Amino acid sequence: MGILEVRGVTRSFGGLRALQDVAFSVEKGEIRAVIGPNGAGKSTLFNVMTGLLAPDSGEVLFNGERISGVPPHRVIRKGIGRSFQITNIFQRMTLFENVQTALFAKHGKSRNPFARSRAFPEIAGETLHILGLVGLDDRHETSASVLSHGDQKRLETAISLASRPTLLMLDEPTAGMSRFESRETVALLRKISTEQGLTLVFTEHDMDIVFGISEKIVVLQQGTVIADGTPAEIKANPQVRKAYLGEEVAE
């Protein structure tokens, strides 16, 4: 059994079926991409897997425990972290304060998220450690508002790591980045996965990144899984090439 199991998940919105009998498994330590055209159901699938939406049928298991329909805050406590396509950070706070606030919530000290570091030295140390994982520890007193888009995504990854996840879900981690920032982000994700033993599941439109970092790929089209396999298997799949990779392959 994988660390994450998606079993026959179906989800509709009114008369629109966003997901239809979606099923795949993610192994511990794996880097897994979920790809598909716009409207394929990727965001809906992520929302079901993280508790923001309940499936109409089917289930999601994490470490063998059913989590579909479980509130998002409980999903986080079970070990799943998530970052979003649009950065979700406090712009008026420093990098240190952003991560520290997430740690206060994790440790049940949310009553005073703006407390001075000396009041909770263990959290201060952990905050700097997490910022170090994403290469931002030397800028911990910088306001989040002045960060580049790429560094804001790094900060959001740090905030996600504050929940101490064993599985991290990333929605378009390189969206809006320059080519240089994208390469840096890919290197960062590889480093985090290796050094922290994290399982990564991500969506991404940049096929160079998808095929450069993924160990397994699941392909969605109109809410249905049309392929699931290694990058080599996905590239060679005629249905995928026709439905999604045509332009990229032609290049």
Tell me the role of every PLM-derived stretch.
Residues M1-E251:
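Glycine-rich phosphate-binding loops of nucleotide-dependent enzymes
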